[in-house]
Amino acid sequence: MVDMKSMNAVEYIADHASNLEYDMLPPLAVKRAGQVIVDTICCALGARDTHLVKLAGEFAAATEPGSESVLWGTDTKLSAAGAAWANALTSKHLEMDDSHRVCGHVAAELVPLAIALCEQRGMSGKELVTIIAAGYDVFGAIQPGVKVAQRERGLDHKSQAGTLASAVVAALAMGLDTNKIANALALSMDMASGTEQYVFDAGLCDTKDLLSGYAVRNGMYAAQLAEAGFQGPPGALDGEYGYYHAFGDGYDPDFLAGIGKEFVIAETGFKPHAGCRHVHACVDATNNLLEQGQPDLSQVEKIKVGSYKNAITPSFRVKYDCDSVNQAGFSLPVTVSVVLNRGSWYKEDIAAFDQAAVQELVPKVEVVLDEQINADWPEKNGCRVEVTTKSGDLFEGHVSYALGEPENMLSDAEFEAKFRYLANGAIPEDNITALCNMVDTVADINDMSELVNLTLPK
């Protein structure tokens, strides 16, 4: 790669993306790419019967008709743009999509777009894997430098860093040269948007999942503009009014230091549970507690949950009086109360947030900042749970890493169990088995139809 000092940030990222080749990817990055691809598809299949997903499919069919790319879980084909948008929203809906400790949720903004465009253009599995890996690297160059400021300002990364990374993914799939990839990235900067107000208004809006769709659509649009010859600002990232300044606290060349040396996709994590990733360590710590002994829930005096700052703030993460399933999926008091009662945290468990047995425990929960766990963040994302009974018995559970993190990765059997749970009933059993096997073979396919045909309902 050319010396970073001779390039601005846009050029440097575009140069890396345009020159990345499949053979440059380490085996772990290829393995994770296969898992990310199948995981994203199965997350979408699991959401197939929900109201929002049906609405998205109807909207995409009306506004983006075509025969280029499959709407997963259906026998409908749409334009590549329509399928990418709808599949992105759908794969995000259950909140079981992948989760990187620093970059956040990445796959929903990149994988549906890459698959739709590769399907449209008859590209191979190796090309798909390489494009997705490049998109993760873009995310990794952009998101960490603004992450803290985003959280303080209530901004959402999916349609911000997600839009920029999607622009590069689209440009690569469209075969654009380095200069046009750079322009796609630069043009997408002014399309980046999105807040987390949807959490406070959960149940009253659909924005959480639409943000992934916005990223896909805007990223693709930016690439189309670049392909047509439009130019974006060279300082779109590191300029005085560029992205790092607008969404963060300014540019630091160290933001780009890992490009070409570290592959972000190899560091991503996966969600074995539903709901927000920041509550998952609480799920695992509670299950760790239950493995050591089941407290009599009718005799619980108090429950204490200790975690890191990002897991306990802002206020919706410690909300006691949730009005909707969407709010409940972010609430630590609800999480620990549900898992103590049910032992799991899937969509059907979160939906039980208002049951009497759960609500009996919620007021007894105290959420605190655990100083040691907070000091370890973001290298670790742990949680500690304590349950004290009226007789003084103490039950404790602790994890240093949520299940699915690189240091506590799901086993192949656990991955397959998740995939089967999500895809069950959406596609034939033989297709589910073949899709599970795609984790290790997706790079070997010659045409994207070999993958997307497995998502058909029959």
Region roles according to the model:
Residues M1-G104, G203-R217, Q224-K458:
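Terminal-appendage/accessory-domain detector
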Residues A47, A114-R121, A167-A173, A222-A226, ...:
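Well-ordered alpha-helical scaffold segments within catalytic/enzyme domains
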Residues S91-P144:
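Hydrophobic alpha-helical hairpins/lids featuring a short glycine-rich hinge
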Residues A107-I115, Q160-V169, V216-Y221, A281, ...:
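Well-ordered alpha-helical segments within folded domains of soluble proteins
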Residues Q120-I132, G175-A182, Q231-G235:
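Structural helix-adjacent loops and short alpha-helical linkers that scaffold large soluble proteins
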Residues V138-L164, S212:
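Aromatic-lined, polymer-binding surfaces characteristic
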Residues Q150-R153, K158-A161, I181, S188, ...:
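Structured all-alpha helical bundle cores of eukaryotic regulatory proteins
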Residues L187-E196:
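Flexible glycine/proline-rich, aromatic-decorated loop/lid segments
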